[in-house]
Design a protein with these regions (language model features):
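Hydrophobic alpha-helical transmembrane segments of multi-pass integral membrane proteins
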Residues: 27-33, 58-96, 100, 112-120
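Conserved small/polar residues in nucleotide/adenosyl-binding loops
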Residues: 190-195
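Short amphipathic alpha-helical coupling elements at transmembrane boundaries
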Residues: 11-22, 48-56, 130, 142-145
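Core transmembrane alpha-helical segments of multi-pass membrane transporters/permeases
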Residues: 1-45, 62-70, 74
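Short helical (or helix-break) motifs at transmembrane helix termini and adjacent helical loops
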Residues: 116-131
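Hydrophobic core segments of alpha-helical transmembrane domains in multi-pass membrane transport
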Residues: 1-2, 33-38, 68-76, 116, ...
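Membrane-interface alpha-helices at helix entry/exit sites of multi-pass transporters
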Residues: 137-149
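Hydrophobic alpha-helical transmembrane segments
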Residues: 63-67, 109, 173-177
Length: 199
């Protein structure tokens, strides 16, 4: 900016200082989030807990995709990372699914990915959430709470889909169709409520 004479050196330094002041809060939140995620992952032995929980529940195989979705969401929300949850759960889920119900292996892997991304999206300690709120210039917790409504709606529809795919032993069309149908009902209810509020 200075060589092209878009701004003077004083303007550049003033803007640089203002920009750094805006990023200090985000940087501190990000460092604390990484610390909390590391504590959950390493000191609290969350991966060991998840593996033991899956192997010892004794639940029927039909509930495996839904259970994996919930566990992935919980783990990702707790640690603030979807990729870390992939790395923790995928090596655990593959042998567990093959031993309990091999037909649901792909559904269980899909549930792992979807639950991890959902948990990461809703987590207040996720780096993507922190940087998104900082980039948009909004309060961090306000950003989390406004995103939660939409994410929980889609997660609820997905959970129903994973229950159906487990019960029907892998019927993808019925599961996907039911999830989309329920999501459409939510959208219709929401738009009708919004239209009533505007009148």
């Amino acid at each position: 900016y200075i060589p092209r004479k878009i701004m003077s050196f004083k303007e550049f330094m003033d803007n640089f200082t203002k920009g750094m002041q805006q990023m200090i809060t985000s940087g501190c939140i990000l460092m604390l989030a990484w610390t909390i995620g590391g504590v959950c992952r390493d000191l609290l032995s969350t991966p060991v807990f998840v593996k033991t929980f899956i192997e010892t529940t004794g639940l029927p195989g039909a509930l495996l995709p839904a259970l994996v979705f919930i566990l992935a969401a919980f783990l990702s929300f707790s640690t603030g990372t979807s990729w870390g949850t992939f790395g923790i759960l995928i090596p655990i889920i593959i042998p567990v699914a093959q031993s309990i119900c091999p037909e649901l292996l792909l559904s269980s892997l899909a549930a792992t990915l979807a639950g991890s991304v959902f948990g990461d999206h809703c987590s207040p300690i996720s780096d993507t959430t922190i940087l998104s709120s900082a980039g948009a210039g909004v309060n961090h917790l306000t950003h989390v709470s406004t995103q939660m409504i939409y994410a929980l709606t889609v997660a609820g529809c997905s959970l129903i889909g994973y229950l159906i795919i487990g019960i029907t032993n892998g019927n993808l069309l019925l599961s996907l169709g039911t999830s989309i149908f329920i999501l459409c009902i939510f959208c219709l209810l929401y738009t009708s409520d919004a239209a009533d509020d505007m009148q």
